């Protein structure tokens, strides 16, 4: 899986000879990447560059922060890297304000965190240093300390890594991590009740927006938690290209959970023919895994626009969640 990123900076300032991008991830033209990935990236890059340069000019010219509806539209069309930290932290409280209490962290949780530190984006230029890994460990410890019902769950290490790389401020990055995980804490913990509930919700949405996929799921008797549970646990990190993840998170942080469902449904719709043609569980799992490297996943601007057009809102999600809670066992 490629996790390359792209930032809207002037063409002349891009170092094409560098093997890593601004977040420290390997570029597709690195010798360690496959040539097919490089060609796919270059085609996307040439179409995406004018979009992000244009969006940055619009952000600098119009200042969308002055109007919530205008800001929503601008966020959906992409937050320039220079403004991303500011927008992500816009509504994030500080731990210094006493919003979260501290709890004792079990030794077993600390052990699990330590085991996953070197496994977190091991090829990333910045996260593989000892100092940054310690920072990552402190961030994950803070989640366990402030949200004991979560403790630590595999996948949160990747979420924390992305936040640290983007925010580039340990204290505020930890604030944001704890804040975002607290909003989705039922995805984690022993019974993962929130994840099971939202897989039920996603199934209902797929039945409405791409019923052919649901027919295949039911024919093969496969649950969405096995297929795409990781999407929701990791908020699509390690499942989609990094620029796509960042664009999704822009919307997720500003608008809420509806964007997890919007993206999931849009990805299934874009790959509906291949998925609905599957005749076995193994074939289905392969097709779902291939979604992350599909053209639909790479062309993030088009994916966001298609997702925004879906009739999925936080209000409709809450209604479906209420129904799902009655249907799933405790």
UniProtKB/Swiss-Prot annotation:
Q: Which domain of life is it from?
A: Eukaryota
For this protein, the parts annotated as crossing the membrane are none
Rab-GAP TBC domain residues are: 78-256
An MF annotation (GO) of this entry = GTPase activator activity
InterPro entries to which the protein is assigned, alphabetical: Rab-GAP-TBC_dom (IPR000195), Rab-GAP_TBC_sf (IPR035969), Rab_GAP_TBC_domain (IPR050302)
* Pfam families membership: RabGAP-TBC
Put simply, this protein is called Growth hormone-regulated TBC protein 6
Q: Which organism is it from?
A: Caenorhabditis elegans
Annotated gene: tbc-6
